[in-house]
Amino acid sequence: EKAILKAVPHVIGRTDWDRQALAVLNPKATYHYGGEIVRDVFYEKKDRQMSKDRPVITTTISFPTYKGYDVILKVANILKNEVGLDFEWNVYGNVQPEFMEKHTGLKHENLNINLKGVASAEVLRDSLLKSTLYFHSSYVENSPNSVGEAQLVGIPVVASRVGGTDSMVEHGKTGFLYPVTDPYMAAYYIKRLIDNKEENMAIGKKAREIALVRHDKRQIVEELLDVYEQIKK
């Protein structure tokens, strides 16, 4: 990837982080902004149906270690065994838990974590609508579609402050950002959103408003066509 970035004259990106990375690796390249279209079902306006039984946290993840499954285990352990919180944490995606659970000494079965496997967009959307918040755990990231999809649904996001996530989540307004190596800070923001329903709803509403603009299909297509025209010149 570095070799390609150093060689190409034009690059499309969408975050402060990828713009700055390009400026370091290839300052002569022209940077073009280009948004991302996400899956259709997440654009639909649906009312939230937060569980009244106990808080529900949702995360979408995959098996590479840099996606932060260990972060989920550590935060869940703090919430359950140090805070004494009763919650449900649904983790979707192709998770292979054995390595990180052995490494951390923490088992998902003991921490209210449900490994749900790969799910359709509709199933994930419905799960998000019932959730108190979306949690993003990655160590390496640029512009995660999962964060954008959660924001489009209208739920607040607690995300690791890595790569380009701070271009998607405005801290305190459309979600909260935490240092990826600090599970206590992550636990604090989760508990804050659980304890303060009014703030939770307000942040979710604002997140959807911003996400609808960021992921606007027509605007993204127009911007991309404009980029192509610029490159042709």
Model-derived features: positions:
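Membrane-proximal helix-turn-helix segments that form the acceptor-binding/catalytic region
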Residues: E1-H10
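Acidic anion/phosphate-binding donor-loop and adjacent secondary structure
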Residues: A23, I37-R54, E101, D126
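Conserved donor-binding/catalytic core segment of Leloir-type glycosyltransferases
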Residues: R48-K67, L73-A76, N90
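Nucleotide-activated donor-binding/catalytic signature segment of Leloir-type glycosyltransferases, i.e.
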Residues: E101-E122
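Aromatic "clamp/platform" in nucleotide-sugar-dependent glycosyltransferases that forms part
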Residues: Y139
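Short hydrophobic beta-strand element within catalytic cores of glycosyltransferases
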Residues: P156-A159
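Conserved acidic donor-binding segment of nucleotide-sugar-dependent glycosyltransferases
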Residues: H171-G172, F176-P183, R192-K197
